[in-house]
Amino acid sequence: MKIKLITVGKLKEKYLKEGIAEYSKRLGRFTKLDMIELPDEKTPDKASQAENEQILKKEADRIMSKIGERDFVIALAIEGKQFPSEEFSQRISDIAVNGYSDITFIIGGSLGLDSCIKKRANLLMSFGQLTLPHQLMKLVLIEQIYRAFMIQQGSPYHK
């Protein structure tokens, strides 16, 4: 199985880079992880709804160009389904059993994701109603993917 993580915006914070590097290394035992950072569009202060929609569309075009036709796509969205870690682990396992070799996770930029990305997604997933920086979500998601594999292995890491 290969996991692809598509994110909008460049990661700048050193502490986040270090955490992501650590969990990426750990994940290497279980899966190939491909991380794709796409540039975000600059959002003007007090942007209109039309400007925001235009920005989301441009970011969506970049995202769509990186999604494989046969990828199982999980998009992070506040309105998505929340899972306990054990259920998330089982979902990842089930996706592989159902014939998907590539899982693509998508984290949008500061404005979120365009509706076309949400429609393409096989699953909308949420980590709750909290608003978190999308750069931080990258670290949280990678840790949860690692945790999912550790749960599948019966490791005490999850305790």
Curated annotation (Swiss-Prot):
It catalyses: pseudouridine(1915) in 23S rRNA + S-adenosyl-L-methionine = N(3)-methylpseudouridine(1915) in 23S rRNA + S-adenosyl-L-homocysteine + H(+). It is an enzyme of class 2 (transferase). S-adenosyl-L-methionine binds at L76, G108, F127, G128, Q129, L130, T131, L132. One of its GO terms (molecular function) is rRNA (pseudouridine-N3-)-methyltransferase activity. Its EC number is 2.1.1.177. The keyword Repeat does not apply. Transmembrane segments: none annotated. Keywords: Cytoplasm, Methyltransferase, rRNA processing, S-adenosyl-L-methionine, Transferase. It is found in: Cytoplasm. One of its GO terms (cellular component) is cytoplasm. Belongs to the RNA methyltransferase RlmH family. Specifically methylates the pseudouridine at position 1915 (m3Psi1915) in 23S rRNA. Homodimer. HAMAP family: 23SrRNA_methyltr_H. This is Ribosomal RNA large subunit methyltransferase H. It comes from Streptococcus suis (strain 05ZYH33).
